[in-house]
């Protein structure tokens, strides 16, 4: 292992991890056997990082390749870092720091938190993306800060989106992040893997968001708790990166620790303009052991809508068509990319959004905003009656703006529809794809995009 992180000494069946520069000794006992079957992608990544054969169920201390904090979770993580005796972070170049949830600052407390994080970044020589770049997960991906075989942690539950790049990426709490900031490593219980096998081509105006909502309906909100979802099959092998990001992003909505797409030509073509990355073969062995395997054929998949107040309560759009809405939100780290916005524009055509509702569109990052601007999409949306905002999380987490009053209904392309997620606990949030959102915004009610 890289001694920069820690040294590993194996004594019989006991692993002793020593963090250089600290009086810190970690003991971990693997529970799996060495004569097991082939390995999953998750097991292979941890084996590479730990320098020995690792199996699901093993508890290991593993180095991380990147650690992300934002304006909500970052301040507490930093305070925990100091409470643990931290003076200098383990590696400033591996820490990703930015603001996206409450930007521009919508309260004095938010402004103070951002000042605190700016001062920390300056003192620690950490590059600060600040509030300029967009939503954390989109920024990590488009800056090439996640790559195949890496372990990335983030103080945000949707960190699992980086699995679209072939990384093992997972969300952690602020206490764990404080530890990571100091030591550059973290304890993990290596998860079992559920293989999601897909086949078929998407029908017209049906796409990755509909697929992942249907998978959530099938697996359930806790059906993949502390497991990795491995997305495979010809549907994924032909899926572009934006769709893979959408699916990996929502792995956590089934309780998963991570979502991973085996890296391929699409992955490396995406990364090559963003960073130098060595191509590695990273796929599960034919004889790997899976906790479960599920098969999904998208050939006849209908547009999906998740009804309040859980993501796994997805139904075919026809079951809720005609439901009046007060607001349509198009954006978030799940569906705020250029491809999503282009789909919205295609459904919109020469039409205009229903004037009885609010339509909020937020590109996921500055780069995605500029792509849409150059393509004429922003002007088209504004002309049609939408409010187009600067890249940020917006209404998704009930933050700075776009909140719902009691009794109001939102249709959203985001990833969660929990009670109170976008404002009042007496409001209702439905989740859908960009195509369904656009069609519904035209008529002020949930609408099947195939009928527009």
Predicted regions and their residues:
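N-terminal non-cleavable signal-anchor helices
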Residues: 9, 19-20, 136
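Intrinsically disordered, low-complexity segments enriched in serine/proline and basic residues
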Residues: 6, 30-33
């Amino acid at each position: 292992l890289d001694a920069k992180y820690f040294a590993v000494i194996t004594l019989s069946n006991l692993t002793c991890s020593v963090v250089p520069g600290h009086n810190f000794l970690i003991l971990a006992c693997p529970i799996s056997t060495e004569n097991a079957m082939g390995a999953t992608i998750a097991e292979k990544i941890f084996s590479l990082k730990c320098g020995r054969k690792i199996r699901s169920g093993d508890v290991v201390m593993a180095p991380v390749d990147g650690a992300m904090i934002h304006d909500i979770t970052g301040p507490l993580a930093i305070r925990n870092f100091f409470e643990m005796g931290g003076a200098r972070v383990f590696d400033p170049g591996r820490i990703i720091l930015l603001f996206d949830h409450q930007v521009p600052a919508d309260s004095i407390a938010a402004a103070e938190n951002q000042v605190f994080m700016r001062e920390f970044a300056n003192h620690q020589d950490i590059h600060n993306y600040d509030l300029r770049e967009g939503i954390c997960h989109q920024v990590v991906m488009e800056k090439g800060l996640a790559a195949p075989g890496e372990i990335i942690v983030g103080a945000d539950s949707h960190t699992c989106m980086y699995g679209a790049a072939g990384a093992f990426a997972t969300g952690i709490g602020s206490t764990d992040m404080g530890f990571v900031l100091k030591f550059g490593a973290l304890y993990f219980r290596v998860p079992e893997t559920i293989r999601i096998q897909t086949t078929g081509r998407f029908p017209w105006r049906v796409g990755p968001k509909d697929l992942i909502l249907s998978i959530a309906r099938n697996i359930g909100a806790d059906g993949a708790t502390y497991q990795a979802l491995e997305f495979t099959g010809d549907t994924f092998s032909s899926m572009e990166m934006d769709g893979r990001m959408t699916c990996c992003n929502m792995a956590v909505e089934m309780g998963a620790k991570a979502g991973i797409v085996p890296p391929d030509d699409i992955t490396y073509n995406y990364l090559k303009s963003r960073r130098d990355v060595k191509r590695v073969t990273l796929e599960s062995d034919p004889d790997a052991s899976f906790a479960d395997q599920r098969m999904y054929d998208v050939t006849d998949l209908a547009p999906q809508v998740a009804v309040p107040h859980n993501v796994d309560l997805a139904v075919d759009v026809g079951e809720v068509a005609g439901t009046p809405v007060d607001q349509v939100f198009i954006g978030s780290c799940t569906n705020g990319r250029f491809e999503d916005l282009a789909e919205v524009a295609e459904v919109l055509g020469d039409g205009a959004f229903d004037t009885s509702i609010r339509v909020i569109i937020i590109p996921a990052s500055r780069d995605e905003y500029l792509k849409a601007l150059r393509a004429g999409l922003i002007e088209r949306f504004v002309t049609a009656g939408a409010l187009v905002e600067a890249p940020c999380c917006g209404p998704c987490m009930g933050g700075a703006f776009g909140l719902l009053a009691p009794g109001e209904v939102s249709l959203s392309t985001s990833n969660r529809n929990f009670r109170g997620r976008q404002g009042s606990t007496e409001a209702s949030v439905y989740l859908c794809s960009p195509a369904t959102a656009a069609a519904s915004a035209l008529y002020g009610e949930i609408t099947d995009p195939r009928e527009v």
